[in-house]
Amino acid sequence: MKDLHKHRSRTVTEGVTRAPHRAFLRATGLDDEAIDKPFVAIVDTYGENTPCSMSLNQISDNVRLGIAAGGGVPIRGSAISVSDGTSMNHSGMRFSLVSRETIADSVELFVRAHCYDCLLYTSDAANEGLGVDL
């Protein structure tokens, strides 16, 4: 029977065959105690291409502190941000809606490939938020 209380990240960290994985995680600065905790992915659409997303770096830094204080291991990732403000009224607008799928795919790949236990996502606008909602 599957242990419902077992963290998904144990797929990456438990057992002799996962020694290389643990070594890789140690190279990121994690110690054995951290490796035993739940891994929480933090993904945002920070970028300097729009004023809407420029605060996301600070927000994610604060989220990181909260996750650590709560007993999790925060692991940051990022997704693209396409600004309608500067992409509209020219060929760039063709990429706005497409960016939603790209965002959704990249966030899913980041979380599933690394077997993270949880995801906290912050975005600045409808395109990015809807991308993850997809």
Feature locations, PLM:
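Metallocofactor- and cofactor-centric catalytic cores in central/energy metabolism, strongly enriched
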Residues: 1-120
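Conserved small/polar residues in nucleotide/adenosyl-binding loops
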Residues: 121-125
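Hydrophobic alpha-helical segments, chiefly the membrane-spanning helices
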Residues: 132-134
